[in-house]
Design a protein with these regions (language model features):
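Active-site core of glycosidic bond-cleaving carbohydrate-active enzymes
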Residues: 2-7, 11, 45-202
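Active-site neighborhood of glycoside hydrolase catalytic domains
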Residues: 1-37, 70-72
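Short, surface-exposed recognition loops and adjoining beta-strand edges that mediate ligand/DNA contacts
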Residues: 30-54
Length: 203
């Protein structure tokens, strides 16, 4: 949905804007109806999976970052973020590693033999942390970031930051660029400081 919003902002042809606006208008209510379960957004509409996906609202983060309208209501975004924080981070290995890509609400794996759902992707975690800051959860963001950074540095990976680390002590995809998302945390914190400074001067 967020790419549609961005396309509407960037599009310079009336036909394109009309098409994208139609798609967006049709999609927004369906997204809520099919995926919202009262606490977080489901992985999909048909499988019945209970998995809490760590980056389920990355589009909402980018929309706010770009100054675009929200994709989902802010109260639902906050509820989903709190669920992600507790399920994927706090309850997953007691918060030692960072947020797993996708686990049940109690932090347990849906499939213990799965690979990607139980990995902690450094870049996804930093993006999630930036979103937490954006939504007023800075303490939680710094705890999450700290856990991931500690895993990287304590395991001697600071000059070969991996894409993924696991609770079993393995890692893969060294020097993966998505970890540069850590700068998004600074970007959001800095933006909040500028807003606060501007408000103070206005008063």
């Amino acid at each position: 949905l967020q790419p549609l919003r961005a396309s509407l902002r960037a599009g310079d042809l009336a036909v394109q804007k009309s098409t994208y606006q139609t798609w967006l208008t049709q999609s927004l209510p369906v997204y809520q109806e099919k995926l919202w379960n009262g606490q977080y957004f489901r992985l999909d509409s048909d499988s019945g999976s209970q998995v809490v996906m760590a980056d389920q609202l990355c589009g909402q983060f980018y929309a706010r970052l770009l100054g675009l309208p929200d994709i989902v209501p802010s109260d639902r975004a906050l509820s989903a973020l709190q669920t992600v924080y507790h399920a994927c981070f706090v309850k997953f290995c007691n918060g030692e590693f960072g947020a797993a890509n996708g686990v049940r609400p109690d932090g347990s794996p849906e499939n213990p033999n799965a690979t990607h759902p139980l990995e902690v992707w450094t870049g996804i975690n930093f993006g999630l942390a930036a979103f937490l800051v954006q939504m007023g959860m800075q303490d939680e963001a710094l705890k999450l970031t700290g856990a991931v950074v500690q895993q990287i540095y304590h395991n001697g990976l600071q000059f070969r930051t991996p894409e993924a680390i696991t609770a079993s002590g393995t890692f893969r995809a060294s020097t993966y660029l998505r970890a540069m998302a850590i700068w998004a945390i600074y970007l959001v914190i800095d933006a909040k400081k500028h807003i606060l400074h501007s408000d103070t001067n206005t008063v």
